[in-house]
């Protein structure tokens, strides 16, 4: 049977960008067993390279809206705890940028984000970050990959219960305090906080069923943008992504509901995030009143153009 062969013919690859695959039973699928294997490898690498200090500093863990993400994140925390490594687990879904921030803010040794970014709904994944809040690069990348690939999934996993991890002080749930610090730092990055008429400037926003709603709505409101309209059909987290089979804000098809709402209320700009909110796309109306969808390169140029020059900084 080809389906059985595909599930078991090889191990799910863990590379420098972590691992990503279809959820399901099998060696070649994302499931609790492969999540535990990846985490055991990460734990082995942390203990081998940073020792007791790294164990005390711990690992931050966040997860997105995808099916299985909550369970995979808890499994990650309990394997780390089983190895004597402190786990800081977000109490509910958070974005990848906030995971990066939390890793630095809590001075953790590493971070783990359970997500498959903008892949179709049947996927999930696991990304590893280092103490600087960035995805692992050399020499950590090769070290973690080799450590993960050396783990025997049946005999090497060290894991304890949630109750035991809490009792030992090896599992700490995090949330509002980190959120507040994250939002504070995000708001400091504003280039111009005193734009005229921003209170009445209409913006349509969509998190595409993902994590963006946790921070984006709050940031815009606190920055004085009071006329923000979130697409109701896409506001709540939903790992099935019922309104968009491919939740990538670089794909203009995901803006269909956003532009319809914008036309209805008279807005000229729409913003959207992918499920883990580390990617943003926009739609804007051109001089003819038609919707235009700048690509990432064009957005980068606009950001560079509006940023202070080194002489102004």
What feature does the model see in each segment?
Residues 305-313:
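Single conserved hydrophobic/aromatic residue that forms the stacking wall/gate
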Residues 34-41, 98, 181-185, 254-257, ...:
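Well-ordered alpha-helical segments embedded in enzymatic catalytic cores
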Residues 137, 290-304:
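Gly/Ser/Thr-rich active-site loops/lids in small-molecule metabolic enzymes
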Residues 1-76, 172-200, 211:
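An N-terminal, well-structured beta->alpha segment
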Residues 75-82, 106-107, 127-135, 218-226, ...:
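A glycine- and small-aliphatic-rich helix-loop capping segment at beta-alpha/alpha-beta transitions
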Residues 3-12, 124-254, 261:
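Gly/Ser/Thr-enriched, mixed-charge loops and adjacent short helices
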Residues 60-123, 226-281:
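N-terminal small/polar loop signature for handling phosphorylated ligands or for N-terminal nucleophile
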Residues 54-59, 81-86, 195-202, 266, ...:
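Short, surface-exposed connector motifs at secondary-structure boundaries
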